[in-house]
Regions:
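The substrate-binding groove and active-site-proximal loops of carbohydrate-active enzymes
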Residues: 1, 33-49, 106-121, 140-152
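Single conserved hydrophobic/aromatic residue that forms the stacking wall/gate
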Residues: 2-9, 13
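Conserved, mostly hydrophobic/aromatic
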Residues: 11, 58, 139
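Proline-aspartate-enriched helix->loop->beta-strand connector
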Residues: 16, 135-136
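Acidic/aromatic-lined carbohydrate-recognition and catalytic surfaces
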Residues: 17, 21-84
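Core domains of carbohydrate- and sulfate-ester-processing enzymes
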Residues: 57, 61, 66, 76-105, ...
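Aromatic-lined carbohydrate-recognition surfaces of secreted/lumenal glycan-active proteins
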Residues: 61-76, 140-144, 168-182
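Glycan-recognition surfaces
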Residues: 93-97, 101-102, 106-109, 113-121, ...
Length: 203
């Protein structure tokens, strides 16, 4: 925790104003204490709530904490482990780490390889847990979130987040890619790109 505090106190961090750590990447390992999965930094190692410690450190310096979720790509991320000899089961039960391990989508477009309702319900619960436990001011979603099967759950997540923010009397933002959200309901993100000219809206 000393290292986290000293990093957050550095001039480099202070000049950034926003700190948005990865809360969960495609591998399904949560960098925070969770009641949903045992595969998290608090239980498995380093036995610390990384997001929680970082929140305390950056907010003590007057900075803003956000979190990013890459969970949706876990739908297929582990599947390549089935292609060679590994500890990856061929037909994983619904466990905390390997499930669901579906094959890579063929085109990674908005309709190919769509995640199941069961998986999206799990995604939504994880997102709400992050919102409730850490009150992030920014909620960033990575690529493939534009998947058509995700759209109803994105609406539910946004409604939950914005309603919670109203209860906290805080302004918050959702960052998204492609057409995951209807324009004007969240903040579009252009990764490794730029607009052709100045725009009158946040991006």
């Amino acid at each position: 925790s000393t290292r986290v505090r000293s990093s957050a106190a550095s001039d480099v961090y202070k000049r950034q104003k926003y700190v948005v750590p990865v809360a969960e990447h495609h591998d399904g390992f949560q960098m925070y204490r969770s009641n949903i999965s045992h595969w998290n930094a608090y239980e498995m190692g380093p036995k610390r709530d990384i997001v929680g410690e970082l929140k305390a450190a950056v907010e003590a310096q007057g900075m803003t904490l956000g979190v990013s979720s890459h969970r949706i790509e876990h739908w297929f991320f582990m599947s390549n482990g089935k292609k060679f000899e590994s500890d990856m089961p061929q037909n994983p039960d619904r466990d905390d780490l390997y499930w669901p391990s579906m094959p890579d989508p063929e085109n990674f477009d908005a309709i190919d390889g769509k995640p199941s309702e069961e998986f999206m319900e799990d995604w939504l619960v994880r997102t709400c847990e992050l919102i409730d436990n850490y009150h992030p001011k920014i909620l960033y979603f990575d690529w493939w979130i534009q998947q058509e099967a995700a759209k109803p759950y994105l609406k539910k997540a946004a409604a939950y987040y914005y309603n919670r923010a109203a209860e906290w009397n805080e302004e918050v933002a959702i960052d998204y890619k492609f057409d995951a959200y209807m324009f004007g309901t969240a903040v579009p993100d252009i990764e490794r790109g730029q607009m052709a000219d100045i725009k009158p809206y946040f991006w």
